[in-house]
Amino acid sequence: MSILPVIFLPIFFYSPFVQTFNVPECIDKGQYFASFMELENEPVILPCPQINTLSSGYNILDILWEKRGADNDRIIQIDNGSNMLILNPTQSDSGIYIYITTNETYCDMMSLNLTIVSVSESNIDLISYPQIVNERSTGKMVCPNINAFISSNVNTELYGADIDALEIRDLNNGHLELLP
């Protein structure tokens, strides 16, 4: 009688199950339509313009600010990342800033252009925010980024033609309402 070799073959093969998700590449939404020009040594706050549209329907887990081609050590994220602060900026802080918003399934980024000018070379026409309101109708003027710097005991100064003929009501949130 001969002995037959017995080979045991497993019925089940062990293979570790690893679930992987493909993280999508960030969608580049391009450059924001408004450029920011600020004075040297005055705090700068850059807003994340997409926060209002994204927060309505998306669960944003992370917001990251970067400066293209430079270290990010001068960037301070405020308001849960929806704004970026630079204290005492210099002209070397001028450049393209990128903010990246991500959640579990989505990633997009947009860039903002920041130019820091010295006080000696500044021109108020470049830094002012011209807005036109028809004097025959109620209008609302919005001063960009003013909420970050305004306090309740600050008087607002307005300059313009026939400004005395209008009633000005401060809505206490950085908005002024002009009534004929």
Swiss-Prot record:
Gene3D superfamilies documented for this protein: Immunoglobulins (2.60.40.10)
Glycosylation site list: N80, N103, N113
Gene Ontology CC terms: extracellular region
Principal subcellular localisation of the protein: secreted
InterPro entries for the chain: Ig-like_dom_sf (IPR036179), Ig-like_fold (IPR013783), IL-1-bd (IPR004078), IL-1_rcpt_I/II-typ (IPR004074)
Signal peptide start and end residues: 1-20
Keywords: Glycoprotein, Host-virus interaction, Immunoglobulin domain, Repeat, Secreted, Signal, Viral immunoevasion
GO BP terms, alphabetized: symbiont-mediated perturbation of host process
GO MF term (any one): interleukin-1 receptor activity
Entry function: May reduce the host inflammatory response by interacting with inteleukin-1 beta (Il1b) and thus decreasing the association between IL1B and its cellular receptor.
Family: Belongs to the interleukin-1 receptor family.
Name of the protein described by the UniProt record: Interleukin-1-binding protein
